[in-house]
Amino acid sequence: MKRFTAILLTALMLLSAGLCGCGLFVDTETKGAYINVYMGSELRSWDPAKSLNDASAVQYLSLCYESMMKYDENGKVVKGICDTYEYDEETNTLVFTLRKTAWSDGRRISADDFVYSWKRILNPDFSCDAKSLLYYIKNARALNEGTATLADVGLASIDTYTLEVTLEQGINYELFLENIASIALAPVREDYASVYEDTWDRSSTNIITSGAFTVKNMESGKEGQRLVLERNKYYNCINYDSISEEIRRDKYVKPFRLIFNFSLSEDDRTTAYNYRAKDGEVTLSDGKTTLNEAADQLHYISGSLASTNALASKAKTDSTLSTMSLFLNTKNALLAKQGVRQALSLALDREALASVYVGAKAATGLVPNGVSYGKVSSSFRKEAGDLLPANADLSAAKSALSSAGVSSGTLTLTYRDTAHNGEIAQSIKEAWEQLGLKIKLNPLDAAHFAHVCSIVEKGNEEYIDPTVYTTTEEVTTAEAVNGEDTVVTKAPMKELFNNGKQPEMYYNYDIVLLDYQTLTPSAFSTLAPFAVGFSGNAVATDYDDYAPRTHMTGYNSEEYNALIEQAFKANDRAEMSKILVDAEKLLLTDLPVIPLFQNANAYLASSAISGETKSINVYGAHSFTKVSQSKFDNYIPSEEKESQ
């Protein structure tokens, strides 16, 4: 088995089965450190437009993708793939010139890559939470309302490396620059995303990236499974052959490889962090992994660290832009009543739920700390104030339920079965059952959780048995579940007669627990998706009467929709934020979403590494480009050396 010198990122993060003994060789080519990074959950899709939906996804995607603009560590918008930009007030256009950087396969990033990627997101058939961030582009919104075509959208390549964007009238172009700094709007490769539409984002051979790292290898769902990211040697280096490894390492990206592993228990992670070579050989609880050299020590622990972890008291914390939340299906007969939703919120002790993780804070609003109000240094959360109680009020919850005319009922709480979600779900179940409700828990793996969160067209449903995820009529797919090729089956789908009238659409869940990720340090990206017309959901363009869809909660408030419309048309961030304060207040009165706690990035670092404090981006994720190991930079696994 391979050994890797270690910087070890856990709690998101887990220690691998790859730490048993073989020697180390000096890397005379000075490629840089091999860094072991231990995360507790894998990324299901490497499509940034679809997968920027929780703190773990942000960690992965921000390592491998870069947008036209980007945020620095303080949340300020700076140039990303853009080299220069110029705004012409008369023509209302922004012209971007791209810098000399390339995809991970060596092909230089072009203006056409942005035209394709942004039109792909804006296509009415495509679902993406970030879609409304592009609505400042001329005819982008009209396209999704059925009054324009893709050809009408204000995106054009002037030449290979120059992109022209025509904006809607009255738009502050600086707000658009802030929006396109989101990782969700990073470009993807048309020759892979269009040809291998259903599989490219899950195959390491088809994932071509624009950022500091690229996907070298993925071993998903297997014993000792791991993900290997390697320095993108073409990042800022289109003349790769003329620049030495040493310059690329020192100037752009210090580590050569990041190795993410997904196997061992929290206790074993603690053992590895505390391990020293003088302790001799130590076997971990899996009975196979041994620690027997200095390189086996965990040097870096980060992520959603459980409060019960033995190392918790030593952790440092940084805020993330994610809020653990509950989405309620307002089309459910019970949850359609605002009084029921209010009762469910009042019954929860947010302080107790937050205490499960180091650094997590009770959410008294949906918009997280770290989101600005006007200036970058200002706080939306501070201006908006506390909208929800941090502690439970069972008496008020029972009163709200009674006022809604409800004394009993059954609800299913669905969640992704990772980290400590089960513990959170169990606490929620116990709180709600004190109200006289019956709560069923439904833990799912990533694939089937995504299915539950997808819209269903009545008459064309996929019928899936929740216990075995199969039905009566089998069809083979390329889907891999739990690391093995699995037959996923579908019931016959009714052929809908297109009479020009859009069929009923719905979501097949009661309540889902998820990590709600803010896409930019702006409250608009948090709140806009709950408004009809800004949800980003695909629309059924095959029907004459197609119209924008609601958020997956089914929430549709004319008053809320109007507030988001006003915010969209605001001319600066402060004016927009003032309107969004009112929007958040209304949203959390109606409560289609119940915020629980704001996640934190809790981490520890040993003296063997440096640069870790410079590597945390505005999302609270580690960029790793500046992290180095002074004692281990020139070491690589012996098996790697022998293969060179």
Describe the predicted segments one by one.
Residues 130-192, 219-222:
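Surface-exposed binding/hinge segments that line
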Residues 346, 360-403, 417-422:
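Structural transition elements
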Residues 543, 603-644:
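Long beta-strand-rich cores associated with HINT superfamily self-processing modules
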Residues 331-374, 423-424, 586-595:
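Periplasmic-binding protein-like
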Residues 38-89, 119, 208:
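N-terminal lobe/hinge region of extracytoplasmic solute-binding protein
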Residues 342, 388, 441-449, 468-508, ...:
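Extracytoplasmic/peripheral linker and loop segments enriched in polar/acidic and small residues
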Residues 170-171, 176-257, 267, 632-644:
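Gly/Pro-rich hinge or "lid" segments in bacterial periplasmic/extracellular proteins
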Residues 216-228, 257-331:
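Extracellular/periplasmic solute-recognition and catalytic clefts
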